[in-house]
Amino acid sequence: MTRRKTGSGIRMKERLQKLLSAAGVCSRRAAEGYITAGRVTVNGETALLGQQADPETDDIRVDGVPLGREPEAVYLMLNKPRGYVTTVSDEQGRKTVMDLLTGVSTRVYPVGRLDRDSEGLLLLTNDGALTHRLLHPSHEVSKEYRVTVSGPVEHAAERLSRVRDVVGLPIRPAEVRELSRKGNRAELSVIIHEGRNRQIRRMCAQCGLEVLRLQRVREHCLELGTLPLGQWRYLTAEEIAGLKEE
């Protein structure tokens, strides 16, 4: 802590980690990550780890939002193409879903994941409470996928619906139905209530099926609809209300 004299007395400058924690932004440990990631600025300059500031006289911001003010909640839907990873940044330099959010000035974060080879509906928001609710297993949020597979496709829907574990972890039975079949290819609708890593791909592998295309078309009350591939839109008030319903 540094004491600094001013015309009206002595003010205290404190480490940014402590100030962010005291303002309820995050824990002190998490604040270190915010600072090193360049998410914190002081008087318009990117903050440095260990830097001190005075919240009464310095303009301290996190993700562009002044300290002590809640950012406006933003909710949007992206039709994610293949080839993009579902992260805010990628150490390997791969394309991320954030590269597709042109025109979005508020920092948002993906709710859950779609793997790099999958496509379809991805929800992004800065509403931490809603994110926690949608991802918590106790809420069993349903997600629907269109899955194109090849291999022994006869009775594939029945076989997939009988899978009870992936990589040794128990799962709820998926709701699977055949939409179309021709030769050794089939298009399936698969509804799951969990989000284990590559769950549907691993279920298919157990049944000797190769996944040719995996597209999420619905999550909870949100439907992908006709949103073009690679494009995004803000959620409607009705959609937001539906997500927040218990």
Where are these regions (language model features)?
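Basic, flexible Lys/Arg- and Gly-enriched helix-loop patches that mediate nucleic-acid binding at interfaces
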Residues: 3-246
